[in-house]
């Protein structure tokens, strides 16, 4: 295959849509149309973006080509399938916040889920690292505390880019007045926000953040790990915070069973990090890199298992200096 040129730097790019109308229209369709029709509309929207959004198409091909070169189990490059899967996930994300996935539709793997639930029942908080692989909205199942064995309401603080998530939050508030999302802007981490994070942990809550993207305002600081056989930059701040709060840390993934069908069936994976955290400034860089390496190892495992549920549509291997394979 012809070599794909390095993509534009995406750090600092603004949200593509500045309107809440697409979210509200999707909600209206979910409320009034049968599922088969919503499926059809979703596929049409995915095809439209696949044809007219060159960057989305090329970055999907770049990722799948790298995966094919790295993995012995992935052999077919299907960028349209990945874009369609992403479109379905967006629809299900809106559906999840207005109509939570029934507990019986979520399959918990035999991993560290029980350890996390037991820890929360003991009033001990945790630091959760997610990614843009799969659908992290499955975490909302924790709200169904009686069904999974959690005996109390768990406070959850989400670290996210408010410039990107603000329109989604506004739309959800209009569609569901019970919608509440305690967010902390990753682009404005101060001593006050760190104190807020610590308070959430000390109250037995969860602090959730994505470990696979750089902060747009702190993109010059990053950790380097090999991902699918090539060096890639990973968030510095997420792993710094994990070591700073020194709380038990878990990697969480939620995946749809079936790539391009609105079926609301999910599988949830919870993996407790083994890296030793805390201990002050001495050795912090080593601990951060150890945690990041552990996360990337799991990310590589799951990306081969669910290859079309990868939702980073940019040059993932580009460093802030505009080069790939930076040292």
Residue spans for each PLM region:
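Membrane-anchoring hydrophobic helices of lipid-metabolizing enzymes
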Residues: 2-135, 171-174
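A generic secondary-structure micro-motif detector
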Residues: 15-16, 50, 162, 187, ...
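Soluble or luminal CAZymes and related metallo-dependent hydrolases
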Residues: 21, 56, 108, 189, ...
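Residue-level marker for well-ordered alpha-helical positions
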Residues: 58, 114, 137, 169-170, ...
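Short, flexible loop segments at the rims of nucleotide/cofactor-binding pockets, characterized by
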Residues: 102-108, 182-188, 227-229, 281
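Conserved beta-strand termini and adjacent loop/short-helix elements that scaffold enzyme active sites
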Residues: 111, 159-161, 184-186, 271-273, ...
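Catalytic core of membrane glycerolipid acyltransferases/transacylases, capturing the structured
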Residues: 120-188, 217-223
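Non-catalytic C-terminal accessory region of glycerolipid acyltransferases
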Residues: 145, 174, 178, 191-327
């Amino acid at each position: 295959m012809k070599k794909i040129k390095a993509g534009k730097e995406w750090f600092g790019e603004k949200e593509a849509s500045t309107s809440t109308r697409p979210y509200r229209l999707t909600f209206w369709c979910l409320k009034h149309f049968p599922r088969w029709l919503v499926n059809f509309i979703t596929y049409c929207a995915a095809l439209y973006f696949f044809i007219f959004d060159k960057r989305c198409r090329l970055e999907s091909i770049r990722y799948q080509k790298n995966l094919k070169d790295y993995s012995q189990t992935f052999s077919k490059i299907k960028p349209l399938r990945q874009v369609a899967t992403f479109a379905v996930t967006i629809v299900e994300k809106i559906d999840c916040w207005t109509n939570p996935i029934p507990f019986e539709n979520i399959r918990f793997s035999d991993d560290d889920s029980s350890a996390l639930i037991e820890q929360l029942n003991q009033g001990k908080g945790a630091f959760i690292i997610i990614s843009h692989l799969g659908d992290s909205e499955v975490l909302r199942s924790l709200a169904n505390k009686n069904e999974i064995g959690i005996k109390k309401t768990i406070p959850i603080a989400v670290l996210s880019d408010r410039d990107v998530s603000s329109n989604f939050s506004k739309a959800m508030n209009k569609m569901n007045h019970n919608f509440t999302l305690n967010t902390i802007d990753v682009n404005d981490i101060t001593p006050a926000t760190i104190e807020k994070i610590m308070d959430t942990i000390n109250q037995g809550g969860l602090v959730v953040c994505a470990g696979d993207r750089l902060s747009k305002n702190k993109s010059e600081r990053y950790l380097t790990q090999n991902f699918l056989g090539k060096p890639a930059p990973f968030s510095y701040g997420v792993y710094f915070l994990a070591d700073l709060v020194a709380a038990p840390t878990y990697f969480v993934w939620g995946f749809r069973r079936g790539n391009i069908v609105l079926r609301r069936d999910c599988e949830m994976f919870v993996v407790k990090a083994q890296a030793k955290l805390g201990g002050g400034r001495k050795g912090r860089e080593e601990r951060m890199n150890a945690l990041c390496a552990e996360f990337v190892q799991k990310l590589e495992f799951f990306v081969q298992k669910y290859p079309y549920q990868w939702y980073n549509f940019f040059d993932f291997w580009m460093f802030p200096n505009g080069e790939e394979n930076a040292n």
